[in-house]
């Protein structure tokens, strides 16, 4: 231990000689006992999570036809994905204790970073190959957000209001650039046409299905204004922008209303009048406004620039997409923004691979998943406030709330901001401790 601790100090790594019991698994002094305490809860949680996930996926893909679902495959998928999640949790806890035992102390990186990377690398090999790229992309998304929050917690960067618009805008511009030069995969062309109404040559709204007053207004918009030679839409630029707004906002309002009702079923049952209040609330209108203004700003900008000479079409489309990203101010969502950014980067990468400019790494998704998940889980231990609240709640449920029982007062030694999410002081038997709790525990709670 002496030689290893000197090596750690020479590498700039402070050490903590506390045991894994008083540091991590304060609910049980025995490492194996602590592991078996967490296992049943994690297994049940994993089965519930993936049973719900695969059921929804199958119902949607089969359009509600339960008789068309392959229930045997459903059961296998649920068990395999649940085993993957439990494996990740188990190896994470086991390796935390093992590294403490092997070294005789903790350092910042052995407090969860190394063990979580190894655990995640082992676990992802259990999961289906078809799901690995999606999991890797999601965790890259989450890890990049966590890293930014981590830097913000220590004052290196600043959290900006509506900052979600920036990564969302970059992602949209990359997608639009690929679409403009004809290299966007077909599966994404549909998404772009739905989100931005970028390549629409037919009527967006069927005038036969709307009331007379609205039909007259729509016909006026279509006939009283003009469009440029560069525009592909069938009617005027004003009409196309307004129609794209109306159509997407209608879909957004429907989706938002359904989700609002599902989330507030109990409240509505207790008092049905609450339904009206919920549907006209500001929260319920955020998604529709975002969905509506996204194509409106894009098409209004693109049609305006089509009237300006010497503006290349590709530059026009890319700039319009970037400007349209300000629509996210109505519905600021980090998960959507980061997913759009990283999915666009992934699409550009594979385009460059296909054209021979970049190499394709075998099992690259396994490596990416291991590193990014390891970083996120490490932050769950040492600095939980850097993690997105939804994912932190997911981890909390996976381990049955035991993540809140870590003795984070000892982590102050490493300079982390650890105690502002889980403030409860853990109870443990001091006879198993190497550091006297009186040195850091408050005398009065």
From Swiss-Prot:
Inducing stimuli: Up-regulated following cold exposure and upon fasting.
Transmembrane spans: 36-56, 76-96, 105-125, 162-182, 278-298, 318-338
Domain of life (superkingdom): Eukaryota
InterPro entries the UniProt entry points to: Tmem135, TMEM135_N
Outcome of gene disruption: Decreased longevity, mutants living for a significantly shorter time than wild-type worms. Reduction in fat stores and reduction in mitochondrial action potential.
Keyword Nucleus attached: no
Annotated GO CC locations: cytoplasm; cytoplasmic vesicle membrane; lipid droplet
Tissue expression remark: Ubiquitously expressed.
Keywords from the named record: Cytoplasmic vesicle, Membrane, Transmembrane, Transmembrane helix
Topological category with respect to the lipid bilayer: Multi-pass membrane protein
Biological process according to GO: determination of adult lifespan; positive regulation of gene expression; positive regulation of lipid storage; positive regulation of mitochondrial membrane potential; response to cold; response to food
Subcellular localization(s) per the UniProt record: Cytoplasmic vesicle membrane
Family that this chain belongs to: Belongs to the TMEM135 family.
Function noted in UniProt: Involved in fat storage.
Protein name: Transmembrane protein 135 homolog
Organism of this sequence: Caenorhabditis elegans
Higher taxonomy: Eukaryota, Metazoa, Ecdysozoa, Nematoda, Chromadorea
């Amino acid at each position: 231990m002496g030689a290893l601790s000197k090596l750690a100090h020479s590498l700039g790594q402070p050490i903590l000689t506390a045991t894994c019991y008083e540091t991590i698994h304060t609910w049980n002094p025995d490492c194996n006992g602590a592991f078996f305490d967490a296992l049943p809860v994690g297994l049940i949680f994993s089965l519930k999570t993936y049973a719900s996930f695969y059921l929804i996926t199958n119902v949607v893909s089969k359009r509600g036809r339960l008789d068309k679902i392959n229930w045997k495959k459903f059961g296998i998928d649920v068990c395999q994905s649940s085993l993957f999640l439990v494996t990740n949790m188990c190896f994470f806890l086991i390796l935390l204790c093992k590294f403490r035992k092997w070294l005789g102390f903790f350092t910042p990186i052995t407090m969860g970073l190394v063990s979580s990377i190894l655990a995640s690398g082992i676990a992802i090999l259990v999961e289906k190959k078809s799901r690995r790229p999606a999991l890797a992309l999601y965790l890259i998304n989450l890890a990049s957000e966590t890293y930014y929050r981590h830097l913000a917690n220590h004052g290196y960067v600043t959290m900006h209001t509506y900052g979600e618009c920036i990564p969302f805008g970059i992602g949209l511009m990359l997608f639009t650039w690929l679409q403009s030069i004809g290299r966007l995969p077909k599966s994404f062309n549909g998404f772009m046409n739905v989100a931005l109404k970028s390549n629409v040559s037919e009527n967006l709204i069927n005038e036969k299905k709307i009331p007379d007053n609205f039909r007259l207004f729509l016909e006026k918009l279509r006939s009283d204004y003009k469009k440029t030679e560069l525009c592909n839409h069938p009617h005027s630029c004003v009409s196309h922008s307004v129609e794209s707004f109306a159509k997407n906002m209608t879909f957004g309002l429907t989706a938002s209303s359904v989700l609002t009702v599902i989330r507030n079923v109990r409240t509505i049952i207790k008092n049905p009048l609450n339904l009206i209040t919920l549907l006209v609330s500001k929260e319920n209108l955020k998604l529709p406004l975002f969905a509506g203004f996204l194509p409106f700003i894009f098409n209004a900008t693109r049609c305006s620039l089509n009237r300006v000479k010497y503006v290349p079409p590709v530059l026009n489309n890319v700039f319009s997409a970037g400007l349209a990203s300000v629509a996210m101010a109505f519905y600021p969502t980090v998960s959507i923004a980061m997913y759009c950014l990283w999915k666009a980067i992934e699409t550009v990468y594979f385009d460059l691979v296909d054209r021979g400019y970049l190499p394709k790494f075998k099992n690259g998704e396994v490596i990416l998943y291991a590193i990014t998940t390891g970083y996120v889980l490490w932050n769950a231990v040492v600095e939980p406030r850097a993690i997105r609240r939804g994912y932190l709640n997911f981890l909390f449920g996976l381990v049955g709330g035991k993540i809140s029982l870590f003795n984070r007062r000892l982590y102050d030694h490493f300079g982390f901001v650890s105690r502002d999410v889980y403030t409860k002081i853990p109870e443990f038997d001091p006879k198993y401790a190497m550091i006297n709790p009186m040195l850091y525990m408050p005398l009065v709670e």
